[in-house]
């Protein structure tokens, strides 16, 4: 018998199953500055005590398994195990509580969102003792965040590259999202950029389909960008979607975009995966490309209140993995987003230091130290009447993206772009003059429409459009 086995036997190893809380529920534990902290919304099965359910989450997302094993004696569980260190009830819910879990930093590979999520939101979400489980927030310590490159460039470098300051950036998703030929697609891009937008965008569905192969799209969009730049004197861009079936193909598309000299590419980071996204972010930093991120598939993960993962966690993960823009809801448009919660994760994307604020869904103080910020993108069902609210809610460091709100203009794409640019400039000027955008927004738009026929036509078309549904993402 080996000495290690004898040592294990000598301390009284007993095969079988024991309660998780005996090992993984440690209310006396004082968290370390280097711990990754998680807040889980836990809904246990009937008869499962909160302490046992919280400890089970800590165990199954770190070192634990369903039974006692011999090899526990070959390592130091106290050093590596996750710990449920605090439990609190959820207001208004009888059978729900928030379990706070601390994870030692050594459990995670440096610079890998993939590895972090494999542990924290892995098999534990299928655990039978739980009816539902949702990861509400993570605290990423500087000791871990410093192992990530983060966004390829960040907010200030992007503004310097584009030479655009003092206002939100304007964008437009080209519609119809599928079915256009590359040449007609490029024409729409040119018209929108020529009309005054800063960016146009591939829809997340657009990769390389039979009706429009990626290389053709890239070429016609590059032509549109350079023509619009020459005519306006402004730097323009189009989010060329490099998302592909393999990482190698994705990088090949990004290389071609760089060779064309365009400023920005795009990636669907959830469907593409964090490993692919981090690889593309590294390529973009090394080669001077901005990186726009779409969050297609996020609602599958984050929309249910009791199970899954809140978008603020996905937003933090994106800042670590890398992206210069990410879609973040609108508050006022057709897509999900309650104001205070949305502003909470918008701050987590942009700011260096964010204090704990439960009224905005922020469970932990987050210090990003030197990790660059990400521009939030407001997109989905917005039009010129929303411009004052969007400018007031999101501020200058944002991208306001009007797809149908540009291309649906009765006079065409270029007038639609003109209407949005005039509305934005009017709102920024009014704000800078001290006017209240929340209270005077409609009047500001009406005043501007008197000297912009394009804006007047847009105001008439969308004056009755509303999306009046309650947000599901509430505290």
Curated annotation (Swiss-Prot):
It comes from Liquidambar styraciflua (Sweetgum tree). This is Ribulose bisphosphate carboxylase large chain. Substrate binds at residues 123, 173, 177, 295, 327, 379. It catalyses: 2 (2R)-3-phosphoglycerate + 2 H(+) = D-ribulose 1,5-bisphosphate + CO2 + H2O; D-ribulose 1,5-bisphosphate + O2 = 2-phosphoglycolate + (2R)-3-phosphoglycerate + 2 H(+). One of its GO terms (biological process) is photorespiration. Its main location: plastid. Mg(2+) binds at residues 201, 203-204. Keywords: Acetylation, Calvin cycle, Carbon dioxide fixation, Chloroplast, Disulfide bond, Lyase, Magnesium, Metal-binding, Methylation, Monooxygenase, Oxidoreductase, Photorespiration, Photosynthesis, Plastid. It is found in: Plastid, Chloroplast. RuBisCO catalyzes two reactions: the carboxylation of D-ribulose 1,5-bisphosphate, the primary event in carbon dioxide fixation, as well as the oxidative fragmentation of the pentose substrate in the photorespiration process. Both reactions occur simultaneously and in competition at the same active site. Belongs to the RuBisCO large chain family. Type I subfamily. GO terms for cellular component: chloroplast. The basic functional RuBisCO is composed of a large chain homodimer in a 'head-to-tail' conformation. In form I RuBisCO this homodimer is arranged in a barrel-like tetramer with the small subunits forming a tetrameric 'cap' on each end of the 'barrel'. Binds 1 Mg(2+) ion per subunit. Residues 1-2 form a propeptide. GO terms for molecular function: magnesium ion binding; monooxygenase activity; ribulose-bisphosphate carboxylase activity. Gene3D superfamilies: Ribulose bisphosphate carboxylase, large subunit, C-terminal domain, RuBisCO large subunit, N-terminal domain. The modification N6,N6,N6-trimethyllysine is found at residue 14. Pfam families: RuBisCO_large (PF00016), RuBisCO_large_N (PF02788). InterPro entries: RuBisCO (IPR033966), RuBisCo_large_chain_AS (IPR020878), RuBisCO_lsu_C (IPR000685), RuBisCO_lsu_C_sf (IPR036376), RuBisCO_lsu_fd_N (IPR017443), RuBisCO_lsu_N_sf (IPR036422), RuBisCO_lsuI (IPR020888). Its cofactor is Mg(2+). The record marks 334 as: Transition state stabilizer. The keyword Chloroplast applies. The gene is rbcL. PANTHER family: RIBULOSE BISPHOSPHATE CARBOXYLASE, RIBULOSE BISPHOSPHATE CARBOXYLASE LARGE CHAIN. Its EC number is 4.1.1.39. The disulfide bond which can form in the large chain dimeric partners within the hexadecamer appears to be associated with oxidative stress and protein turnover. The modification N-acetylproline is found at residue 3.
